[in-house]
UniProtKB/Swiss-Prot annotation:
Binding site for Mn(2+) 1: 403, 407, 462
Protein name, UniProt field: 2,3-bisphosphoglycerate-independent phosphoglycerate mutase
Catalytic activity of the protein: (2R)-2-phosphoglycerate = (2R)-3-phosphoglycerate
Protein function: Essential for rapid growth and for sporulation. Catalyzes the interconversion of 2-phosphoglycerate and 3-phosphoglycerate.
Cofactor(s) this protein cannot do without: Mn(2+)
Binding site for Mn(2+) 2: 12, 62, 444-445
Cofactor note: Binds 2 manganese ions per subunit.
Organism lineage string: Bacteria, Bacillati, Bacillota, Bacilli, Bacillales
Active site as annotated: 62 (phosphoserine intermediate)
């Protein structure tokens, strides 16, 4: 029997903005998106700030977006949870954080703090590092070392000096902390199994290997002089006057990894925390008996303590589809596969009964502006086969291109990325319509809508602009005040499935 699938198609990083300058969305030729927008009911959704459980004005991101979409409700994010804990005095009483400090004190070893040095709020927030420094000081710990990952992606590409200046002021104010290594996030926060990058960061932190400098500022200046900006700064070692490293991570040290977003934290965490790690040779000096703390739950694969444990999300979209014996497909390429599976399932790694997953490998290129098409065509071919085979009742699809290429801050490659996705979108939606099905076309956050600032500088961060939503079914009217948490209830309405009470979002269909 022919299925009439309902598909949720997420154009990652594709938001709407009136200003044309630096806007790859308006510059791109996208006849299919425009056709669906003009022919079918459409509206915009809020995908940032309080609408997705973030602080007011905070840009959304893929993890947050997919959590909200899959949960069918506003999910209060780790950034908000940790901020509230700091504000209300709960952070300094967190038993897991205190246990790490106690371990270092009792063993007479060092406490290492590592994470992203910015206030981007996507993977980390520098205020959380400052809170950890205050905690260490209040507990009388003196040997505290910082391994800073430079951002330049969720914030301006050359902003490291600003954050280092502020960090050094805090170190002086609190009387605790010293920078031991610096590394661009390209190396320390890889998520695509490019272990040669992670290894460089690891060896800087453990072996003191890599370019050496007498200060963090000297490291950044030298990198800038060589045309290497924050995200791509080589893992580097800060040295004392005698040329030896300020500190390396050694046996029985304590580590607190203060990033809160899991996807780019897993690989480097496994490198330190897991005894059975085999992805590269860690060498004889690999620190044994580390007390390793993750700020949040990164993955079942990470053997570490968790300071802020997950909030259980019951009756997510995937679970409800499964309970109603509907076949569902999750499909994406590598870069967004965790988002359309793990995050969309509320932090659940396992498949639900009746769930199929298709992972298409992302291309092995240094940066995606070199191949803006990424693997969109391969994703499309795989999905068209599923649609033609009448295999699925519900389809959850992510196209990574607008976001991943948008992060380059380059207009032409991002335009090419959107034009590629538009071509694929046309084929997929037309195939769904031919089966009598319906597509919900939307996005999780902004990015490609501003890749060049009004001043003409590269813009590599996300935006707070609203995202589109199109429902390819005539005779409907959509609300204009929607949020990402309303998408799952909308999909359930189209599938004629009752919405569970845990889903507090509201269908967009009037």
């Amino acid at each position: 029997m022919s299925k009439k699938p309902v598909a949720l198609i997420i154009l990652d990083g594709f938001a709407l903005r009136d200003e044309d300058k630096g806007n790859a969305v308006t510059h791109a030729k996208k006849p299919n998106f425009d056709r669906f927008w003009n022919e079918y009911p459409h509206a915009t959704l809020q995908a940032s700030g309080e609408a997705v459980g973030l602080p007011e004005g905070q840009m959304g991101n893929s993890e947050v977006g997919h959590l909200n979409i899959g949960a069918g409700r506003i999910v209060y994010q780790s950034l908000t949870r940790v901020n509230v804990a700091i504000r209300e005095g709960e952070f300094e009483q967190n038993e897991t954080l205190l246990a790490a400090v106690k371990h270092a004190k009792e063993k007479g070893t060092n406490l290492h703090l590592f994470g992203l040095l910015s206030d981007g709020g996507v993977h980390s927030h520098i205020e959380h590092l400052y809170a950890l420094l205050r905690l260490a000081k209040s507990e009388g710990l003196e040997k505290v070392y910082i391994h800073g990952f430079l951002d330049g992606r969720d914030v301006a590409p050359q902003s490291a000096e600003t954050y280092l200046k502020e960090l050094n002021e805090k170190i002086e104010e609190y009387g605790v902390g010293e920078i031991a290594t610096l590394s661009g996030r390209y190396y320390s926060m890889d998520r695509d199994k490019r272990w040669e990058r992670v290894e460089k960061s690891y060896r800087a932190m453990v072996y003191g290997e890599g370019p050496s400098y007498t200060s963090a500022e000297e490291c950044v200046k030298d990198s800038y002089d060589n045309g290497i900006y924050d995200e791509f700064v080589l893992p580097s070692v800060i040295t004392k006057e005698d040329g030896s490293p300020v500190a390396t991570i050694q046996d029985e040290d304590a580590v607190i990894f203060y990033n809160f977003r899991p996807d780019r934290a897993i690989q480097i965490s496994n490198t330190f925390a897991n005894e059975d790690f085999r992805s590269f040779d860690r060498g004889e000096k690999h620190p044994k008996h580390l007390h390793f703390v993750c700020l949040t739950h990164f993955s079942e694969t990470v053997d570490g303590y968790v300071a802020f444990k997950p909030i259980n999300l019951d009756n997510t979209l995937g679970e409800v589809l499964s309970q109603n014996n509907l076949k569902q497909l999750r499909i994406a390429e590598t870069e967004k596969y965790p988002h359309v599976t793990f995050f969309m399932s509320g932090g659940r790694e396992a498949e639900f009964p009746g769930e199929t997953r298709i992972l298409i490998d992302s291309p092995k290129v240094a940066t995606y502006d070199l191949k803006p098409e990424m693997s969109a065509y391969e994703v499309t071919d795989a999905l068209l086969a599923e649609i033609e085979g009448d295999k699925q009742d519900a389809i959850l699809l992510n196209f990574a291109n607008p976001d991943m290429v948008g992060h380059s801050g380059m207009l032409e490659p991002t335009v090419k990325a959107i034009e590629t996705v538009d071509e694929c979108l046309g084929k997929i939606v037309d195939a769904i319509l031919a089966k009598g099905g319906t597509a919900i076309i939307t996005a999780d956050h902004g990015n490609a809508d501003e890749v060049i600032t009004l001043e003409g500088n590269p813009m590599t961060a996300h935006t707070t602009n609203p995202v589109p939503v199109i429902v390819t079914k005539q005779g409907l009217e959509l609300r204009e005040d929607g949020i990402l948490g309303d998408l799952a209830p909308t999909m359930l309405t189209l599938l004629d499935v009752a919405q569970p009470k845990e889903m507090t979002g509201k269908t967009l269909i009037k």
